A protein has these predicted regions:
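Contiguous alpha-helical scaffold segments within structured protein domains
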Residues: 3-79, 151
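Hydrophobic aliphatic residue packing
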Residues: 1-2, 127
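Glycine-rich, small/acidic residue-mixed loop/short-helix segments
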Residues: 67-73, 77-152
Length: 152
């Protein structure tokens, strides 16, 4: 929903400002389709000449979309609540070149192969007002889109 998307966008922009990055550009919200699911996407770009990409990544990740807010309190809560290894779920992935250019995304669904078995992982954001049944349906759609990539 747009409210959730705006919450994450505002979090990212506030953290850019915290790092004294003021010359950012925020694009328009667009709908991106992935298999049988659509996501709201907003490109945020900035010139970060003197900041190591990994410092920036550490400050921005994890965002409220995959962790909660405030970040430290949410991380502690998730650690106490979850009894499984998230693996690479919700991890940033991307590249950095020798000139310091970088491009990172967040893996909102993933798969890994362990001991000859494939394991899929996907999640959903629960916020005040979320309807759990709809969130479960969303997770099922995400998992189906992964399975379709592998098995179709």
């Amino acid at each position: 929903c747009i409210r959730d998307s705006n919450f994450v966008i505002n979090y990212l922009i506030e953290n850019l400002k915290f790092l004294n990055i003021r010359n950012y550009k925020k694009g328009e919200i667009k709908i991106k389709k992935f298999g049988n699911i659509a996501h709201l996407c907003t490109l945020i770009s900035a010139e970060v000449n003197k900041i190591c990409p990994f410092v920036l990544l550490e400050k921005l990740h994890p965002s409220p979309a995959v962790c909660g807010f405030p970040k430290e309190k949410a991380l502690d809560y998730l650690d106490s609540l979850e009894n499984f290894d998230r693996g690479n779920y919700a991890s940033p992935f991307g590249w950095v070149d020798v000139e310091g250019n970088a491009d990172f995304r967040v893996a909102l669904r993933g798969a890994r192969i362990l001991n000859g078995e494939i394991e899929f992982i996907a999640g959903s954001g629960l916020v005040k007002g979320s309807i759990c049944e709809k969130e479960i349906d969303e997770i099922k759609l995400k998992l189906a889109s992964l399975a379709n990539l592998i098995f179709d």
